[in-house]
Amino acid sequence: MSKLVKTLTISEISKAQNNGGKPAWCWYTLAMCGAGYDSGTCDYMYSHCFGIKHHSSGSSSYHC
């Protein structure tokens, strides 16, 4: 059984963390935010996943 275990290198872990979930995770979150389910992360997700930010009249908001 111990032969089934694979030890990940630091670079493999970093790569998985940096790419984890994209794009499916981002599209799922976008759909949930668009449906009105906001757990306080929608602004962050729009910025992180899509890099979309809208500035108007001194305030900023994210949009698709």
UniProtKB/Swiss-Prot annotation:
It comes from the Bacteria. NCBIfam families: glycocin_F_RiPP (NF033417). The gene is gccF. Keywords: Antibiotic, Antimicrobial, Bacteriocin, Disulfide bond, Glycoprotein, Secreted, Signal. It is found in: Secreted. Disulfide bonds join 26-49, 33-42. The keyword Cell division does not apply. Residues 1-21 form the signal peptide. Has antibacterial activity against L.plantarum ATCC 8014. In purified form, the activity is bacteriostatic (IC(50)=2 nM) rather than bactericidal. It comes from Lactiplantibacillus plantarum. Glycans are attached at residues 39, 64. One of its GO terms (cellular component) is extracellular region. Gene3D superfamilies: 6.10.140.1280. The keyword Cell membrane does not apply. This is Bacteriocin glycocin F. GO terms for biological process: defense response to Gram-positive bacterium; killing of cells of another organism.
